[in-house]
Amino acid sequence: MRLLYVIHQFFPDCHSGTEQYCLAIAREARRCGDEVTVLSLHWDYNRSKPAIELFEQPYDGFRVLRLNHWLEVNPNGVLRDYENLHLEGWYRRVLDDVRPDAVHFFHMRQLGSHLIPLTRRLGVRAVVSLTDFWFLCPRFTLLRADGALCEGPPDGGRGCVACDQPDLAGAVPDAARSAVWSPGARLRALLDRPAVQRECLLQADAVFAPSRFLAELFAANGCAHPRMDVVPYGLEPGRIARAAVARPRTPLRLGFCGVLSPWKAPHIAVAALRAVKPPVALRIHGRLEEPMFADYIGALRAAAKDDARITFAGAYDAKAASQVFADMDALVVPSTWYENTPFVVLEAFAAGVPVIASDLGGLREVVREGHNGALFPAGDAQGLAAAIERVAARPQWFDADGFAAVPTNAAGYDRFRAAYAGS
């Protein structure tokens, strides 16, 4: 079976959870004898290449087509996020070249959801994996500007104005969408976004969500696709080796692994340590050079600088992951946004490490109090401190033999493959 996997960014330039998942499923497809080509956007901020250009940059043995897209081709940044009709001809060229039996969309930001119905019109099956809230939220996080949680586009999208584009509060929307950079054009694009995204998503042949929470949230926002199925994330076989470690140790070794962003909320873990009574240490793993979060990371380091128990260990690669978890007694996931199932949680379970997580989103589906970790109210440093103390006081919670087996991607790929084939 010939397959085209479409994603908004890809290795080696970008390697967050969505890219990792796309690569893992591509490897599973290859193991099954299927042929995968990846189409990824190449975000061009400075016009270092022709405005739009298709070029190849193989990765991990896969053919990877990169579509260079100078952002100013569509200066309306609100519209560019979800609709770029000028890319349709380039996409047709890719389909003519690859001739796939199915296209699997992993993320479509800055490419455009209109590629879903276009794929169907061209006689190719279109499958979508939901990996975050981009189809619902222009900020893709379902977090309002003040950090509060959102349940979906309020007031048909009008509620998104104050949150995502506050400077448009007094603007008058244009009559039709256009690529023009003007208040009226941007407001029209923002108001049209919910309906366009919903209409395009519902035209897919099949839609997959990694958690019941995500599937139910999309259904509540009018995106109850008749072929919506839940396929939990899995790990590649052998990704994490479980070390023979006697847990818990003294001091209790806590770890945070992930992007140092406000919604991943390592600051909650830093604040919680001040209230924890038993001896404890925290290693924070994540890139310290993130331009988008430079101010946040600076404040985080300042908050921790006088606490010798806290170490900033930087990022690590896949080869080092097993050792990172071997050195850890419990993983802390203090996210303040709706997580699905972060891969780092599955990696922790595979390593025999319990997880202390926010009681939000898909985390509630995999972290079970007293079995493989503990839950606490999101954003509550005192609640996290109490959860850490509960775990520290119960050595039996560190018995990894009681953890449920971590799924691999094989079962999920079987369901994807059935969707590719139309069954």
Question: Language-model features: where?
Answer:
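Short hydrophobic beta-strand element within catalytic cores of glycosyltransferases
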Residues: V333, V345, P354-A357
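A conserved mid-protein helix/loop that constitutes part of the nucleotide-sugar donor-binding site
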Residues: Q20, S261-A275
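A charged, aromatic-enriched C-terminal amphipathic alpha-helix characteristic of glycosyltransferases
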Residues: P395-S423
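Carbohydrate-associated surface elements
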Residues: H42, F213, G234
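Acidic anion/phosphate-binding donor-loop and adjacent secondary structure
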Residues: A219, H225-D229, G234-P251, Q323
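Short, structured helix-loop element that forms part of the nucleotide-activated donor/catalytic region
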Residues: R47-E56, A220, R283-R309, A320
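Conserved acidic donor-binding segment of nucleotide-sugar-dependent glycosyltransferases
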Residues: E369-G370, A374-A381, R390-P395
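N-terminal subdomain of nucleotide-sugar transferases
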Residues: M1-Q57, R63, D96, L122, ...
